[in-house]
């Protein structure tokens, strides 16, 4: 629906590049440093952004991202402040695709119509609602269509053919392919390259397939891109750098810059 993801994929394919999309939680460890981190990621290889809206009970996330949510709340983050940050990020870079990951309660509390209207005004590209399955997504989808915002749904690596058909019908922007079942994190093994699975999924959809969950090194990224997906989403490994360097912003930003450049280079096939 929103053409930034389509344009990104179209621009990268001729050069045999996959896209690299980092994930961080807005407001972690503070609003000011969070913005510095995001601007650094944009400058150092990020093709798109996936940004988490802090939530008190993030069921889809492992301990690393849960702690990031807690740090953001300690910095007094609110949904309103998240929108203000997103506006600054969009103003900073009008071209980069920006997706947000959010939990349904936050949308209900604000109001579905108002939420999507604000996202549209900020020029957000996509919304992934972590705890709303396709079967319960109708009302959200209607508002996303009305506001020209892509609906992102996750695809487990063991999904049935019936689910893949449903997924291809409802997904816009891209399909978020999970490396494995469970929660986010960097300590657990990811599923081996899903080449045959990706091949079957591509028969049903032409939108980009982007893989995330547990991706923490260049070899994983290279193998994932070679399996036929369009790109990777990497979060926990970046957020761990934030957690390990809370008392030294300079080192934190230096390590994130280095990692981001390495990960982008790994998408070259």
UniProtKB/Swiss-Prot annotation:
List the catalytic activities from the record: (1S,2R)-1-C-(indol-3-yl)glycerol 3-phosphate + L-serine = D-glyceraldehyde 3-phosphate + L-tryptophan + H2O
Pathway of action: Amino-acid biosynthesis; L-tryptophan biosynthesis; L-tryptophan from chorismate: step 5/5
Gene3D superfamilies noted in UniProt: Aldolase class I
Query: Record keywords: Amino-acid biosynthesis included?
Result: yes
Q: What's one Pfam family here?
A: Trp_syntA
Q: What is its EC number?
A: 4.2.1.20
* EC category: lyase
Domain of life of the organism in this record?
Answer: Bacteria
Q: Which GO terms describe its cellular component?
A: cytosol
Which keywords are on file for this protein? Amino-acid biosynthesis, Aromatic amino acid biosynthesis, Lyase, Tryptophan biosynthesis
| Keyword flag Lyase | yes
What InterPro entries does the entry give? Answer: Aldolase_TIM, RibuloseP-bd_barrel, Trp_synthase_alpha_AS, Trp_synthase_suA
Active site, renumbered: 50 (proton acceptor), 61 (proton acceptor)
Q: Mind listing the GO molecular function terms for this protein?
A: tryptophan synthase activity
In terms of HAMAP family, this protein maps to: Trp_synth_alpha (MF_00131)
Q: How does it assemble?
A: Tetramer of two alpha and two beta chains.
Q: What does this protein do?
A: The alpha subunit is responsible for the aldol cleavage of indoleglycerol phosphate to indole and glyceraldehyde 3-phosphate.
Looking up NCBIfam families in the UniProt record yields: trpA
Q: Which family does it belong to?
A: Belongs to the TrpA family.
Protein's recorded name: Tryptophan synthase alpha chain
Q: Which organism is it from?
A: Buchnera aphidicola subsp. Baizongia pistaciae (strain Bp)
